[in-house]
């Protein structure tokens, strides 16, 4: 298993005393003892962490799509699964389960503790406050959904007279292609939305 490094840093008055190096050296020793040969870090400044043996493993990609450009040419839309919209609280355990299944066969995804879900993915305060309320759309049977999207919907962010709203995707997971197509069809049906943005695709 990979070790995950969380926030690390020193206050300015304690910098350049080797404190971070000591913390990292000790952490690496403990990780080695646990059999963790690899460590991952989401760095604010990648160049700083090269001195500790880290390197960039990927790039962040983002997309912005006009809803008028979302088309499902391969299968059409007649047999797509149902999508239902919810507030996050009642479906948190459901989406956590879908996420765990979704990441099981994929590389680069991290296990998320409840705090990460509540603050980062579903949070409506702090840095996320301007995004507006958070919604979860579940796709598939109500008793066994096959995918979800966590998103916000806000008005006045698209320079279009008839479609001024924007959907911001926070998280998206699907367990089969019908669920994936169903979620994108759900976006396309938002007639007042001029843009679907996914900053961390």
What are these language model-derived features?
Residues 2, 10-38, 42-43, 51, ...:
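Acyl-donor binding region in acyl/amide transferases
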Residues 74-201:
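Intrinsically disordered, low-complexity, positively biased terminal segments
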């Amino acid at each position: 298993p990979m070790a995950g490094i969380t926030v690390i840093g020193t206050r300015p008055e304690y910098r350049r005393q080797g404190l971070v190096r000591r913390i990292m050296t000790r952490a690496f020793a403990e990780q080695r003892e646990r059999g963790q040969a690899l460590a991952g870090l989401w760095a604010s400044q990648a160049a700083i962490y090269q001195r500790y043996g880290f390197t960039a493993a990927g790039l962040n990609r983002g997309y912005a799509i006009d809803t008028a450009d979302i088309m499902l040419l391969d299968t059409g839309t007649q047999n797509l699964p149902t999508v239902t919209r919810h507030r996050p609280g009642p479906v948190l355990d459901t989406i956590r389960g879908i996420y765990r299944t979704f990441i099981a066969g994929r590389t680069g995804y991290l296990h998320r503790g409840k705090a990460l879900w509540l603050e980062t993915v579903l949070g409506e305060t702090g840095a996320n406050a301007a995004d507006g309320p958070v919604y979860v759309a579940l796709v598939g049977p109500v008793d066994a959904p096959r995918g979800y999207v966590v998103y916000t919907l806000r008005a006045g962010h698209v320079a279009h007279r008839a479609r001024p709203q924007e959907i911001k995707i926070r998280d998206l997971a699907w367990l089969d292609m019908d669920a994936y197509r169903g979620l994108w069809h759900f976006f396309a049906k938002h007639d007042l939305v001029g843009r679907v943005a996914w900053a961390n695709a």
